[in-house]
Amino acid sequence: MPLHNLTRFPRLEFIGAPTPLEYLPRFSDYLGREIFIKRDDVTPMAMGGNKLRKLEFLAADALREGADTLITAGAIQSNHVRQTAAVAAKLGLHCVALLENPIGTTAENYLTNGNRLLLDLFNTQIEMCDALTDPNAQLEELATRVEAQGFRPYVIPVGGSNALGALGYVESALEIAQQCEGAVNISSVVVASGSAGTHAGLAVGLEHLMPESELIGVTVSRSVVDQLPKVVNLQQAIAKELELTASAEILLWDDYFAPGYGVPNDEGMEAVKLLARLEGILLDPVYTGKAMAGLIDGISQKRCKDEGPILFIHTGGAPALFAYHPHV
């Protein structure tokens, strides 16, 4: 078992049973290709999402260190911050969130609805900044201030994307491999690639468990030149933690995130509407809509390695739909 070292790391059980891996019959008929979806949008806390897998490891480490406060950062509409705040509430911890407005909007829905509304329900302490130009340093500075107030803070990086958090997606690769075994031979796996932890964790896990499947990361905020080192560095850090090799090539598509992070585009919104109308499944304008736009275009452009079944990793994000009205 190449991933046996995963069990060495403390982990809280937030998710329980594996999330569904489903065939999408109407969407498959529409695209002329077998499409499956991994439903990490239905993880069981705070309207779901992929970050809960990372937080199982990160929150366990926070408790091990005796922390009473979780500190993290992201956009006003960050899914990661929302899920971190929910975990803090569940564990009886304080949560401080450092937020930016990356799209510079004054739209009331963006500033107050969606994920931002949920932060208030979770009693999150909000700190605003002009921009997360150096989030690691900014989080450390915030942690110093919080500690001076008598709290014991634990810093969770943007997206929960460090080697420890990304173990959640090595774990997910195990789930996927078990669900596919004897049922379907997946040719390509498509995932949104942003803070890179989900992508890198899957890269390490799938290399050892499903080596014949290609993993495609569709970038949501950066060009390949900027995103590749983030994914590779995390891939290697995860491999080091697990004492194994990671030599799989990182494949990225950067044609679908323009005009920029957090700004909806026509192709992404069309993908959101398409999956809603054909399968009753909700994507989001920031991550999964753009990743699905990549999948759709990738099929039409024959960018995938062959004509075999494709698995789409649904990382969640539907609460942001309410924040982006009337774009939706």
Curated annotation (Swiss-Prot):
GO terms for molecular function: D-cysteine desulfhydrase activity. Pfam families: PALP. Signal peptide: none annotated. InterPro entries: ACCD_DCysDesulf, D-Cys_desShydrase, D_Cys_desulphydr_bac, TrpB-like_PALP, TrpB-like_PALP_sf. The keyword Lyase applies. Its EC number is 4.4.1.15. Belongs to the ACC deaminase/D-cysteine desulfhydrase family. Homodimer. This is D-cysteine desulfhydrase. It comes from Escherichia coli O17:K52:H18 (strain UMN026 / ExPEC).
